[in-house]
Amino acid sequence: MVAIVDDDPRLLESMGDLLESAGYVARSFSSAGSLLVNGLSDLDLLITDIGMPGIDGFELRDLVRKSRPELPVFLITGRHEIADQGRAQGVGGFFRKPFDAQALLAAIANALHKSTDGG
């Protein structure tokens, strides 16, 4: 299952539709807190916005890595200044909004293939 975390309901809907049309099971969460309450055990991949109230995407990624270090995490942002920060550097799954849907799907497929191959 692919979890999508974003405080923008339009992005949640469009991203969910995109993933489901590509054959993935997607669950949408409007905040990091709602994802954490639901639990991480069912997840195969996490896509999270960076700029959210409360726990932001960087903090969520760090929390997830403590309990599920093997879980692929993709960060997305519409704020280009965030994309240029040091915290975003070296993140393999990093996308700026608006992102290319096919590039995102290819990156998801690649990340899931790597995780099923054990690395």
Q: Residue ranges of each PLM-predicted region?
A:
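Conserved phosphotransfer cores of two-component systems
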Residues: 39-42, 63-70, 89
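Acidic, metal-coordinating helix/loop segments flanking the phosphotransfer/catalytic sites
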Residues: 28-45
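Two-component/phosphorelay signaling modules centered on CheY-like receiver
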Residues: 9-27
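C-terminal output helix
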Residues: 99-111, 116
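Hydrophobic/aromatic residues positioned on beta-strands within the core alpha/beta folds
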Residues: 74-76
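Active-site residues of response regulator receiver
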Residues: 49
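Receiver (REC) domain active-site loop signature in two-component systems and cognate sites
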Residues: 52
